[in-house]
């Protein structure tokens, strides 16, 4: 009987399960557990805090440095852009001004021969006498003298690529000086010495000097080439005018054959000059 009751007791499944909830655990056990864990691992928590604080400080410092570097680079790029824009605008303005100045001088240089030729033609038409015929011959012979001197001296131009022919003396300066001096002599002969004649003479000489200076500014001749051309043209014009008054005028007024000869030579010279203009001046203006 006792054996059977003990076997039933062993095989009997208990009706209640006893377990403690988290809230039912005594508080002193939890606090003790917390104290144990915190007392066991105090260094790890401090190290983690220090590591986090150091890494956080480093990351913040790196972030500040990166932002500062980016701000500095952005400001530097902005300054570079502003400097580039300002330099570009100033260079563009300088180029526009220089191009405008060079364009005006280039146009004036191309028109100079036409203006001087028109001035010379006007003087010849106003004179319409033997001195005008003599001046035509002198102008053409002055140009021939310039070509001969160029071949003899054979001095290169300042920029050989612009013109291949020699530059000493300047044929433009020599021709302009010849015509300017002859025009001044004609004005003084017509009007005498007064305020008007002096003003016109000064204007003619100033215009001729400006046109000769353009040959230097356009790098077609050196200063010495222009000065030599101006001196040769002025001296040749003076001698040509003096020769007319001292020698040719008397023979022209007294001898008909001299008049015919002078007229034919002047006509041939004018025709040759016209052919030269058609072959060279229009080609240079293109």
Curated annotation (Swiss-Prot):
Description of pH dependence: Optimum pH is 7.0.
GO molecular function: phosphatidate phosphatase activity
Taxonomy, superkingdom: Eukaryota
Presence of keyword Membrane: yes
UniProt EC number: 3.1.3.-
Stored CDD domains: PAP2_dolichyldiphosphatase
Protein location: Plastid, Chloroplast inner membrane
Tissues showing expression: Expressed in root tips, root branch points, cotyledons and leaves.
Annotated membrane topology: Multi-pass membrane protein
UniProt activity-regulation remark: Inhibited by Mg(2+).
A cellular component annotation (GO) from this entry: chloroplast
SUPFAM superfamilies assigned: Acid phosphatase/Vanadium-dependent haloperoxidase
SMART domains: acidPPc
Record's function text: Exhibits phosphatidate phosphatase (PAP) activity in vitro. May play a secondary role as PAP in plastids.
PANTHER family in the cross-refs: LIPID PHOSPHATE PHOSPHATASE EPSILON 2, CHLOROPLASTIC, PALMITOYL-PROTEIN THIOESTERASE/DOLICHYLDIPHOSPHATASE 1
Family: Belongs to the PA-phosphatase related phosphoesterase family.
Protein name in the entry: Lipid phosphate phosphatase epsilon 2, chloroplastic
Lineage, uppermost ranks: Eukaryota, Viridiplantae, Streptophyta, Embryophyta, Tracheophyta
């Amino acid at each position: 009987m006792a054996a059977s009751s003990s076997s039933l007791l062993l095989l009997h499944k208990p009706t209640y399960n006893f377990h403690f909830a988290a809230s039912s655990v005594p508080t002193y056990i939890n606090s003790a557990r917390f104290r144990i864990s915190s007392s066991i691992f105090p260094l790890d928590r401090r190290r983690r805090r220090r590591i986090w604080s150091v890494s956080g400080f480093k990351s913040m410092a790196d972030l500040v440095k990166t932002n500062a570097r980016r701000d500095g680079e952005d400001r530097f790029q902005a300054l570079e852009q502003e400097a580039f824009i300002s330099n570009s605008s100033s260079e563009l303005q300088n180029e526009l001004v220089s191009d405008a100045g060079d364009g005006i001088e280039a146009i004036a240089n191309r028109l100079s021969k036409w203006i001087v030729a028109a001035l010379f033609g006007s003087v010849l038409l106003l004179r319409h006498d033997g001195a005008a015929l003599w001046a035509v011959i002198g102008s053409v012979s002055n140009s021939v003298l310039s070509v001969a001197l160029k071949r003899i001296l054979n001095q290169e131009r300042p920029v050989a690529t612009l013109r291949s022919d020699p530059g000493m003396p300047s044929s433009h300066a020599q021709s302009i000086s010849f015509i300017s001096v002859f025009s001044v002599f004609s004005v003084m002969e017509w009007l005498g010495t007064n305020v008007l004649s002096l003003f016109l003479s000064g204007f003619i000489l100033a215009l001729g000097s400006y046109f000769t200076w353009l040959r230097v500014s356009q790098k077609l001749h050196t200063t010495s080439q222009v000065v030599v051309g101006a001196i040769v043209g002025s001296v040749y014009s003076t001698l040509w005018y003096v020769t007319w008054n001292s020698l040719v005028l008397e023979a022209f007024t007294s001898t008909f054959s001299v008049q015919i000869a002078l007229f034919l030579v002047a006509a041939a010279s004018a025709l040759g000059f016209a052919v030269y203009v058609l072959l060279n001046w229009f080609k240079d203006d293109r």
